[in-house]
C-alpha cells in the first residue's frame, strides 16, 4: 500500500503543477495589477519529505521542475535547478522544519522567497525578464509571499491530519 501511495503521488505531480498554475491565473484575474504565484506545491513537498526517501524526493523535484519549466518558461533549466536545490535543502532539514506549525510556516515563507528570488535572478540573467528588482519585489514577490502564507495557514491542518 505504501508503494502504491508513492507511485500514485508521483504520477499526479504534473497535475498538481497545472492546478497550481490555474489557481494563480484565477487569482490574477481578480488582482490584475499584481502577479500572484500560488506555490501550494511547496506545502505538498514540505510534508512529502516524511513519506519518501531522499532520492525519490529529488526525482519528484526534478519532474516538478521540468513540468514547471516547460509550462511557464518554455526553457528547461531554471525551475528544475531551483526545485532540486530547494528539495535537497528541505529533505536535509525536515526533522527541524516539521517540529511545529511555526517552523513549517517559516519554511513556507523562506521557500517561497528563495524560489521567487532565484527564478527572477536566473530569468534576468538569461534575458527572460527586464523588470527592475523594485518592480519585482512590490508587484510580484510580496503578494506571492502573502498568498502562500495564507495557503499554509489554511491548509496546514489538512496536511497534518494526512501526513502526521
Swiss-Prot record:
InterPro entries: Cell_shape_determining_MreD (IPR007227). Signal peptide: none annotated. GO terms for biological process: regulation of cell shape. Keywords: Cell membrane, Cell shape, Membrane, Transmembrane, Transmembrane helix. It is a multi-pass membrane protein. It comes from the Bacteria. NCBIfam families: shape_MreD. Involved in formation and maintenance of cell shape, probably part of the elongasome which synthesizes peripheral peptidoglycan (PG). Belongs to the MreD family. This is Cell shape-determining protein MreD.
